[in-house]
């Protein structure tokens, strides 16, 4: 089911987001130590931030800001935080994100509609081939989203091709959630052990962590290598801990879908200036 707001025209979506933006700014002024300081230092009057275009009046918050002021981004008392997740730390120290009950509900909604976008339906069985522990937000998000959707889940975790294939043959999942390059190892293992993977129950994979499309939305070499061997649907998805939102491909395989009820998305250049489509 497509959320109603996502079927509105651009003007209606902008009006919807502008209203939520004003509420968000007011919330930050009331609850965020970091943004209280930032708005004061930049002489930002919250009454002047009414539209997405007005965000240009506020300087960009970058990853270094979050790393250096991590605790000042928390907007609730510690006892309201139910789960702690961190970024991978590939570009420096990991950043901690504390999730409240409402945050977990939002995370579940985000993945539910993202899975629906990829064609997953209530009653389908999905094999989760990523970790759900080690402070990894995505694994938890997938579990919560599938549960909210009403789909079944086989929690296998990362790696271990023998266990992955045992689970596929034993439980017959329709979809996998996996890092695409690992699918090549799955194929190699199947071929070495006479597993008829081409006629398995698997119809599609929601692929995380690696690109499946070029800038022109053509399949990458990785996607081609997988599908030359295994004729299954490969849905690309992009997300980050900072956004707590996903951009997942539908059955048109032409790029991820933006969910305007969850996040305002802006693409900027190296000077942090907005750029037009295609730039």
Feature roles, as predicted:
Residues 120-124:
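Short helix-loop-beta connector
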Residues 101-114, 125-185:
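AMP-binding/adenylate-forming
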Residues 1-86, 92-109, 113, 117:
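Nucleotide 5′-phosphate-binding alpha/beta core
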Residues 115, 119, 190-191:
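Structural motif corresponding to the C-terminal cap of alpha-helices
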Residues 91, 132, 211:
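Short, flexible active-site-adjacent loop segments at beta-strand->alpha-helix junctions, enriched
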Residues 95-96, 135-136, 212-216:
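A generic structural signal for short coil/turn motifs at secondary-structure boundaries
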Residues 1-12, 16-27, 33, 149-279:
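Active-site glycine/GP-rich loop and adjacent strand/helix microenvironment
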Residues 44, 52, 78-85, 129-135, ...:
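Short low-complexity stretches enriched in small and charged residues
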């Amino acid at each position: 089911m497509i959320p109603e707001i996502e079927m509105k025209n651009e003007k209606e979506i902008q009006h919807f987001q502008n209203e939520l933006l004003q509420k968000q700014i007011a919330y930050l002024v009331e609850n965020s130590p970091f943004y209280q300081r930032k708005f004061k230092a930049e002489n930002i009057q919250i009454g002047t931030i009414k539209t997405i275009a007005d965000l240009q009046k506020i300087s960009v918050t970058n990853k270094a800001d979050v790393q250096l002021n991590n605790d000042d981004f928390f907007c609730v008392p510690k006892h309201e935080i139910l789960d702690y997740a961190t970024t991978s730390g590939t570009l420096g120290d990991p950043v901690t994100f504390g999730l409240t009950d409402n945050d977990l509900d939002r995370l579940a909604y985000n993945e539910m509609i993202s899975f629906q976008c990829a064609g997953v339906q209530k009653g389908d069985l999905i094999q989760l081939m990523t970790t759900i522990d080690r402070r990894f937000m995505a694994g938890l998000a997938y579990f919560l989203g599938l549960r909210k959707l009403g789909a079944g889940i086989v929690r296998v975790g990362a790696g271990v091709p023998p266990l992955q294939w045992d689970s596929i043959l034993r439980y017959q999942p329709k979809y996998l959630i996996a890092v695409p390059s690992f699918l090549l190892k799955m194929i190699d293992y199947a071929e070495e052990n006479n597993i008829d993977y081409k006629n398995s129950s698997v119809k599609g994979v929601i692929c995380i962590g690696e690109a499946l499309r070029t800038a022109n939305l053509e399949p990458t070499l990785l996607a081609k290598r997988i599908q030359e061997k295994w004729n299954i649907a490969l849905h690309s998805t992009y997300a980050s801990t900072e956004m707590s939102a996903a951009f997942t491909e539908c059955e048109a395989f032409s790029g991820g879908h933006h969910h305007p009820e969850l996040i305002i998305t802006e693409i900027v250049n190296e000077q942090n200036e907005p750029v037009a489509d295609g730039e």
